[in-house]
């Protein structure tokens, strides 16, 4: 995808991870990464590259099967995602959906 990229700041608990990612994907976006700020190590980034519901399902299954905590668990749920949308209109739709769900943090 080569479109509009934006870094968004979100906050939620581990239980809301799937809903957050699907909100982005179902509204036409791609989730490239997740980044958290650590007091000692600085920014810690995990590559995601999620483009479909199947990608999200596989990611969530891996997290469950490995009993892994989401990266944002070390930052009180605050994290950023680099997301991408094919058009500015779709990016706006994604942001409005995230805001409606209470995921955006400012």
Predicted regions and their residues:
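Mid-protein regulatory/catalytic core that forms ligand/cofactor-binding pockets
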Residues: 6, 10-106
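Minor-groove-contacting beta-hairpin "wing" of winged helix-turn-helix DNA-binding domains
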Residues: 1-2
